[in-house]
Amino acid sequence: MSKLGVLLTICLLLFPLTALPMDGDQSVDRPAERMQDDISSEQYPLFNQKRRCCGEGASCPVYSRDRLICSCC
Protein backbone atom coordinates (compact mmCIF):
# COMPACT_ATOMS: atom_id res chain seq x y z
CA MET A 1 0.00 0.00 0.00
CA SER A 2 2.88 2.39 0.67
CA LYS A 3 4.19 1.84 -2.88
CA LEU A 4 0.84 3.01 -4.23
CA GLY A 5 0.98 6.10 -2.02
CA VAL A 6 4.49 6.93 -3.22
CA LEU A 7 3.43 6.44 -6.84
CA LEU A 8 0.38 8.66 -6.34
CA THR A 9 2.50 11.36 -4.69
CA ILE A 10 5.03 11.30 -7.53
CA CYS A 11 2.26 11.51 -10.14
CA LEU A 12 0.63 14.46 -8.38
CA LEU A 13 3.96 16.25 -8.13
CA LEU A 14 4.73 15.72 -11.81
CA PHE A 15 1.22 16.50 -13.04
CA PRO A 16 -0.68 18.62 -10.53
CA LEU A 17 -4.45 18.91 -10.71
CA THR A 18 -4.14 22.63 -11.37
CA ALA A 19 -2.73 21.82 -14.81
CA LEU A 20 -6.13 20.50 -15.89
CA PRO A 21 -8.48 23.08 -17.44
CA MET A 22 -11.35 24.01 -15.17
CA ASP A 23 -14.76 25.23 -16.30
CA GLY A 24 -13.94 28.76 -15.19
CA ASP A 25 -10.87 28.88 -17.46
CA GLN A 26 -12.83 28.27 -20.65
CA SER A 27 -14.19 31.12 -22.70
CA VAL A 28 -17.90 31.74 -22.83
CA ASP A 29 -19.68 31.69 -26.15
CA ARG A 30 -21.06 35.18 -26.71
CA PRO A 31 -23.08 35.25 -29.94
CA ALA A 32 -24.06 38.91 -29.47
CA GLU A 33 -20.41 39.96 -29.49
CA ARG A 34 -19.72 37.79 -32.52
CA MET A 35 -22.50 39.55 -34.39
CA GLN A 36 -20.93 42.92 -33.56
CA ASP A 37 -17.59 41.73 -34.97
CA ASP A 38 -19.23 40.67 -38.24
CA ILE A 39 -18.33 42.74 -41.27
CA SER A 40 -21.40 44.41 -42.73
CA SER A 41 -22.02 46.75 -45.61
CA GLU A 42 -23.37 49.33 -43.16
CA GLN A 43 -19.97 49.66 -41.49
CA TYR A 44 -17.91 49.22 -44.65
CA PRO A 45 -19.65 50.75 -47.70
CA LEU A 46 -17.08 49.25 -50.12
CA PHE A 47 -17.88 45.71 -48.93
CA ASN A 48 -20.39 43.71 -50.97
CA GLN A 49 -21.91 41.22 -48.53
CA LYS A 50 -23.31 38.89 -51.22
CA ARG A 51 -19.99 38.33 -52.95
CA ARG A 52 -17.81 38.90 -49.87
CA CYS A 53 -15.86 41.19 -52.13
CA CYS A 54 -14.66 44.76 -52.12
CA GLY A 55 -16.00 47.35 -54.54
CA GLU A 56 -14.11 49.73 -56.78
CA GLY A 57 -11.51 51.88 -55.13
CA ALA A 58 -10.84 49.44 -52.31
CA SER A 59 -7.46 47.92 -51.68
CA CYS A 60 -7.39 44.13 -51.86
CA PRO A 61 -6.96 41.82 -50.10
CA VAL A 62 -8.57 43.33 -47.02
CA TYR A 63 -7.96 41.92 -43.55
CA SER A 64 -9.83 42.53 -40.32
CA ARG A 65 -8.17 41.32 -37.11
CA ASP A 66 -5.82 39.09 -39.13
CA ARG A 67 -8.80 37.50 -40.92
CA LEU A 68 -9.27 37.77 -44.69
CA ILE A 69 -12.57 39.46 -45.51
CA CYS A 70 -12.01 40.35 -49.16
CA SER A 71 -9.94 38.37 -51.62
CA CYS A 72 -11.34 39.16 -55.07
CA CYS A 73 -10.12 42.17 -57.01
Swiss-Prot record:
It is found in: Secreted. Disulfide bonds join 53-72, 54-70, 60-73. One of its GO terms (cellular component) is extracellular region. Expressed by the venom duct. Residues 1-19 form the signal peptide. It comes from the Eukaryota. The keyword Aminoacyl-tRNA synthetase does not apply. One of its GO terms (molecular function) is toxin activity. The cysteine framework is III (CC-C-C-CC). Classified in the M-1 branch, since 1 residue stands between the fourth and the fifth cysteine residues. Shows a paralytic effect in fish. Found in injectable (milked) (IV) venom. Surprisingly, the propeptide sequence 36-49 has been identified in the venom. It is unknown whether it is a by-product of incomplete enzymatic degradation of the precursor, or if it has a biological function on its own. Belongs to the conotoxin M superfamily. This is Conotoxin CnIIIE. It comes from Conus consors (Singed cone).
